């Protein structure tokens, strides 16, 4: 595979990668929107506690998601435009965006491996605080917030061996609500599904980002070295000076000018001292064609020398 074929394949793969990165950015943006405005996360975040453990984690996740969406989208747009227009600056900008997006995703993966249950613990701690204050009856607002959480997660109460609230818990779940699952289990199952989707998007994002980094770096060097497909077979025409004639081979000029021009060249080649032994064709780069009177004068001079018998020079005719 030649260099032009490799550049062509890299361009096609770069455009396809940018398309999938745009789809990935749209998916991440949808997930971030659902995380921030979704009922399951919003009902926990809106709990009016003095210190909500989940609120700080929620804000951090939302900011990181928006930053990642912006970097992926901007990098895909810049790289696609640079691939089509073969712009070195745009390709460098796309490479920078993909590098930052790669660093952000690596940070997310490291955070997931280092603290895999941080979001889950924050949500469960928030629910525990709302549940305990509602069961103690210190505030009517806490009971409304607890009821809202249970309606959203379709759960009721919690089954914990560390609970010391007595018979008040039995009055919370009655009728159809008693058949619901434990709220702690309901929150864990919901977060498990959400985290699986987030992990899948992060893995796909890392693969696409690495591919985009490789393609963008290769195309950047290709554009810098001038390996451009769109310019293949095109030539740059430099403007010619005013009054300057184009250069032609002397043989072509003789064939176009006829025998008179050839005889003039022969006379010039022989010179005033005699014959040079062989006819030399002249490469006149900048000289303009002489008028017909000059050609006739040279022809007559050549005929006179031939008839007079120049020393050491064979007799030449027009047949040569």
Curated annotation (Swiss-Prot):
Expressed ubiquitously at low levels. High levels of expression are confined to hematopoietic tissues including peripheral blood leukocytes, thymus and spleen. Coiled coil: none annotated. The keyword Protease does not apply. It is a multi-pass membrane protein. InterPro entries: PHEMX_LEL (IPR042782), Tetraspanin/Peripherin (IPR018499), Tetraspanin_EC2_sf (IPR008952). GO terms for biological process: cell-cell signaling; cytoskeleton organization; defense response to protozoan; integrin-mediated signaling pathway; negative regulation of myeloid dendritic cell activation; negative regulation of T cell proliferation; platelet aggregation; regulation of defense response to virus. The chain crosses the membrane at residues 14-34, 60-80, 90-110, 203-223. Belongs to the tetraspanin (TM4SF) family. This is Tetraspanin-32. The gene is TSPAN32.
């Amino acid at each position: 595979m030649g260099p032009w074929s490799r550049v062509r394949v890299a361009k096609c793969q770069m455009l396809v990668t940018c398309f999938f990165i745009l789809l990935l950015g749209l998916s991440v943006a949808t997930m971030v929107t659902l995380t921030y405005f979704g009922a399951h996360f919003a009902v926990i975040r809106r709990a009016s506690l003095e210190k909500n453990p989940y609120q700080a984690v929620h804000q951090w996740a939302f900011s990181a998601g928006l930053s990642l969406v912006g970097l992926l989208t901007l990098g895909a747009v810049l790289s696609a435009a640079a691939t089509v227009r073969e712009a070195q600056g745009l390709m460098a900008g796309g490479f920078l965006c993909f590098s930052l997006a790669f660093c952000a995703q690596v940070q997310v993966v490291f955070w997931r491996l280092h603290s895999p249950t941080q979001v889950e613990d924050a949500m469960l701690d928030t629910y525990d605080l709302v549940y305990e204050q509602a069961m103690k009856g210190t505030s009517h607002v806490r009971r409304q917030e607890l009821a809202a959480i249970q309606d959203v997660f379709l759960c009721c109460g919690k089954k914990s061996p560390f609970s010391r609230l007595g018979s008040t818990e039995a009055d919370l779940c009655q009728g159809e609500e008693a058949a619901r699952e434990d709220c702690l289990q309901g929150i864990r199952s919901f977060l498990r599904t959400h985290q699986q989707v987030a992990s899948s998007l992060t893995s796909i994002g890392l693969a696409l980002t690495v591919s985009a980094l490789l393609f963008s770096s290769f195309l950047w060097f290709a554009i810098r070295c001038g390996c451009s497909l769109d310019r293949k077979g095109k030539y740059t025409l430099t403007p010619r000076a005013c009054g300057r004639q184009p250069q032609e081979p002397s043989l072509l000029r003789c064939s176009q000018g006829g025998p008179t021009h050839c005889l003039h060249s022969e006379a010039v080649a022989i010179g005033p001292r005699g014959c040079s032994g062989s006819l030399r064709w002249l490469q006149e780069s900048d000289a303009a064609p002489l008028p017909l009177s000059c050609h006739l004068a040279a022809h007559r001079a050549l005929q006179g020398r031939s008839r007079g018998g120049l020393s050491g020079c064979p007799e030449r005719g027009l047949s040569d």
